[in-house]
């Protein structure tokens, strides 16, 4: 049994440092193909199937145009936490006024932390959104700003414009 990686699948004559300059998706596609798998959608991933209807939540919070912030991170990765979200929120409100609502959608463990930010905390019946609700909230946002965390990766997969920040 051989572990499949770029190190094990790349021909000896190819330079790994050059290969590593390719995008993650291109490298992943190469690895899958050389392992004998068909790769129809690897270079064009589509995560939109993972979203659910959140119209009721959007009505409750009057969400039309909104900027979604994810100022959270895993407790053991606090180095990734950017400390200036409230400053950013003030800049957004000063520039756009009520044109965009500034919101956040914490996980169940982040609900108390969300109170530290001057953003509307989006919950479903006082509970954190599930992954499909979160995906739809991200998908419908005007822009996203996040620490290097799961929602930032979801935003990339559903094609939402945004910015990922680190400490």
What do the PLM-derived regions correspond to, one by one?
Residues 1-167:
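Catalytic machinery of carbohydrate-active enzymes
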């Amino acid at each position: 049994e051989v572990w499949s990686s770029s190190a094990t699948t790349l021909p000896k004559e190819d330079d790994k440092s050059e290969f590593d300059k390719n995008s993650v998706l291109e490298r992943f596609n190469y690895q899958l193909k050389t392992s004998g798998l068909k790769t129809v959608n690897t270079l064009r991933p589509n995560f939109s199937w993972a979203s659910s209807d959140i119209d009721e939540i959007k009505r409750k919070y009057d969400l039309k145009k909104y900027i979604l912030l994810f100022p959270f991170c895993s407790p053991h990765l606090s180095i990734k936490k950017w400390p200036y979200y409230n400053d950013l929120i003030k800049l957004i409100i000063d520039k756009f006024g009520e044109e965009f609502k500034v919101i956040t959608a914490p996980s169940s463990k982040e609900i108390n932390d969300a109170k530290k930010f001057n953003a509307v905390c989006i919950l479903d019946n006082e509970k954190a959104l599930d992954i499909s609700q979160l995906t739809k909230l991200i998908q419908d946002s005007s822009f996203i700003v996040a620490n290097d965390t799961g929602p930032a990766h979801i935003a990339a997969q559903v094609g939402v414009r945004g910015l990922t920040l680190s400490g």
